[in-house]
Regions:
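N-terminal pre-domain/capping segments
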Residues: 1-96
């Protein structure tokens, strides 16, 4: 796995008492609900453009999102550079 988010480990369930901002407090992927795991009930997804290309601009100004993996071009090299970053994001977020 690449290391584009070195200060972020895989996000885990820590329970409602956790003060970790990067922890699941109520979502426990392995907990059974009505005979089925939460992971199977709640199939999370991530939209590629919103995660990897959205500069967070609005009608009041240009975007402020800092994405060091993106050089701002529409080149194939730039597109290919984003792929491992997105997969790392998915893995650390536990999105299958």
């Amino acid at each position: 796995m690449s290391d584009h988010f070195p200060d972020v480990s895989k996000i885990e369930f820590e329970g409602p008492g956790s003060d970790n901002p990067l922890a699941f407090r109520h979502y426990n992927p392995d907990e059974l609900v009505a005979g089925k795991s939460m992971k199977d009930h709640l199939r999370f997804g991530a939209a590629y453009w919103h995660c990897m290309r959205n500069p967070l601009g609005d009608p009041f100004g240009a975007g402020t999102a800092h994405m060091p993996w993106d050089d701002g071009s529409e080149s194939l090299d730039n597109a290919l550079a984003r792929v491992p970053v997105f997969f790392e994001f998915l893995e650390k977020s536990q999105i299958d």
